């Protein structure tokens, strides 16, 4: 059976212009019965104003989960979103990723017990990212390959993800050498399974925190399905001042231990317990 109540968890931090473009994309979804959950890692009043503006438009069912700004605590706000939701199925993305119109419908259609879905994304250049208007997003033209190239996006094989023929999408999903890993821009699974592995590991910071969750889901017994050519989002460009070598090294060590020990429980997750469960 398909999920009964779908939530789309959208992380954000002080990027109101990008968030507005993303929410404009979710207003155009072909499947409308979902809740957009803004997982906000401490943004200011401008972001709250964007959320309020879209809530007042009455198209989206919006929830705003906010925490005080105390540095990069993305995993913590994601865990709060998971713990507080009534949705039985969650799609995860970021506040800089504009969804194609069938993204929610595709995740809903392909959802299956014991699986997570690994969707695709296309990174836009900064000039193209800045140029997109809410009107263009609403029209859906931004997902046309030739239109993007004319706007200034470089030609690339990655634009094949915009193919609309299902048989081509399925063929490329099977042929791609990319692993069906958990991708924080476009992945989904059942809420009960996220709770079973204790959510995201709050010891993780920027750099691989999404992959680490997927690796623990695999250890838990989950399988993953590649849908990177079936549904995509356009990733708006931005700086990454929070990426530091020492953090990457720490995160790599955590992931190495997860793989070595085949652990699935995040000791510093939704439940704050250091005793690993088996």
Where in the sequence are the language-model features?
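Short aromatic/hydrophobic "clamp" motif used to bind/position activated sugar donors
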Residues: 90
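Short, acidic, metal-binding catalytic loop of nucleotide-sugar glycosyltransferases
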Residues: 24-33
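A conserved acidic beta->alpha catalytic loop
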Residues: 40-50, 97
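Acidic donor-binding loop at a coil-to-helix junction in glycosyltransferase catalytic cores
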Residues: 185, 206-213
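Conserved donor NDP-sugar-binding/catalytic core segment of glycosyltransferases
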Residues: 102-151
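Glycine-rich, basic loop-to-helix element that forms the pyrophosphate-binding segment
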Residues: 68-85, 102
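Short beta-strand/loop segment that forms part of the nucleotide-sugar
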Residues: 33-43, 63-67
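Short, flexible, basic/aromatic active-site loop/helix in glycosyltransferases
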Residues: 137-179
């Amino acid at each position: 059976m398909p999920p009964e109540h779908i939530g789309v968890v959208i992380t954000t931090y002080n990027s109101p212009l990008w968030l507005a473009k993303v929410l404009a994309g979710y207003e155009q979804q072909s499947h409308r019965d979902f809740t957009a959950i803004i997982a906000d890692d401490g943004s200011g009043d401008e972001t709250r104003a964007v959320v309020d503006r879209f809530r007042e438009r009455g198209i989206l069912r919006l929830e705003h989960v906010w925490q005080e700004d105390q540095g990069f605590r993305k995993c913590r706000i994601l865990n709060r979103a998971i713990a507080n939701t009534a949705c039985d199925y969650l799609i995860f993305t970021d506040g800089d990723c504009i969804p194609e119109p069938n993204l929610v419908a595709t995740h809903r259609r392909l959802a299956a017990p014991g699986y997570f879905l690994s969707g695709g994304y296309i990174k836009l250049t900064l000039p193209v990212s800045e140029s997109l208007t809410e009107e263009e997003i609403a029209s859906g033209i931004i997902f046309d390959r030739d239109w993007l190239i004319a706007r200034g996006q470089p030609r690339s094989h990655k634009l094949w993800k915009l193919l609309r023929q299902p048989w081509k999408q399925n063929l490329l999903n099977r042929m791609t050498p990319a692993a069906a890993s958990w991708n924080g821009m476009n992945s989904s699974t059942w809420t009960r399974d996220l709770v079973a592995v204790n959510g995201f590991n709050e010891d993780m910071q920027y750099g691989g925190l999404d992959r680490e969750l997927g690796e623990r889901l695999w250890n838990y017994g989950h399988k993953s399905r590649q849908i990177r050519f079936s549904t995509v989002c356009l990733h708006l460009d931005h700086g990454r001042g929070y990426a530091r070598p020492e953090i990457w090294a720490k995160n790599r060590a955590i992931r190495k231990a997860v793989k070595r020990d085949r652990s699935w429980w995040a000791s510093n997750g939704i439940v704050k317990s250091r005793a690993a469960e088996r």
